[in-house]
């Protein structure tokens, strides 16, 4: 599923450039992705759109609060992912409403705890879905696969 999300980011400048879901599914299948992964990715993207709509009110709230994670969130996300989300927020890359969307989409992931590389992809897709300006250094960090670097 995450390979498909990166593929979409690399091949479509904005979410509006993506074709309708049925056409996109056919294109992804033609690109060699498995149907189960395509269904998972499209479902995840649908959830992203729903969550974004729900967070519109949150965007109006002042961002002076402090985020406390529940035990369930901590178990699903893990300390490395929570630390990275906090880093993005403190660096001004991820405002509070987008942070909540990242957390929601990470909790929708079947992986537990969600690896740091997956959190980076989730954050990238949330920023992409909002057509946010992404600094080149931030983009490089979000697309960096630490797991691949650790292999000798």
Curated annotation (Swiss-Prot):
The regions listed as transmembrane in this protein's record are none
Pfam families listed in its UniProt record: DUF494
Give the UniProt family note: Belongs to the Smg family.
- What is the protein named? Protein Smg homolog
């Amino acid at each position: 599923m995450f390979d498909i999300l990166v593929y979409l980011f690399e091949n479509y400048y904005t979410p509006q450039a993506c074709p309708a879901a049925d056409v996109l599914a056919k294109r992804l299948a033609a690109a060699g992705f498995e149907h189960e992964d395509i269904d998972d990715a499209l479902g995840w993207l649908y959830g992203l759109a729903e969550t974004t709509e729900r967070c519109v009110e949150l965007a109006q709230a002042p961002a002076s609060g402090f985020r406390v994670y529940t035990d369930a969130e901590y178990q699903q996300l893990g300390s490395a992912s929570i630390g990275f989300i906090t880093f993005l927020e403190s660096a001004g890359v991820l405002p509070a409403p987008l942070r909540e969307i990242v957390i929601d989409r990470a909790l929708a992931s079947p992986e537990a705890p969600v690896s740091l590389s997956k959190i980076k992809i989730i954050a990238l897709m949330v920023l992409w879905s909002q057509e946010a300006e992404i600094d080149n250094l931030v983009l490089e960090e979000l697309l960096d696969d630490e797991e691949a670097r650790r292999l000798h």
